[in-house]
Amino acid sequence: MLHLTNLQTKGYDELIEINGEVVYQVFAIKKNNGTYSTYYYTVPKNKLDQAEDYEIEEFNEFNELELAIKHIQSKGANLLRFNIFKGNKPL
């Protein structure tokens, strides 16, 4: 199970091939005073320079960690890859 302390953001980014197309993805979960925010971002790698036209960016909020985890996993996240974000955080 994923463990988060208050105001901590965990997740990862990756380049992955999906249906023959390489895409850049970001997955994240943040705990904030009993609520859990999720972040999902994806854009085709060959469209990174035009991301605003091709990206999908989603922010969601949940009252339970289990619901946040189920949601982010439904987007393709692998919880085993989640780690503390360093530098620029998506949430």
Where are these regions (language model features)?
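Generic low-polarity alpha-helical segments
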Residues: 24, 36-38, 68, 72
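Short aromatic-glycine-(Arg/Gly/Cys) micro-motifs in beta-strand/loop hairpins
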Residues: 26-56
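Mixed-charge, Lys/Arg-enriched low-complexity segments
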Residues: 1-7, 47-91
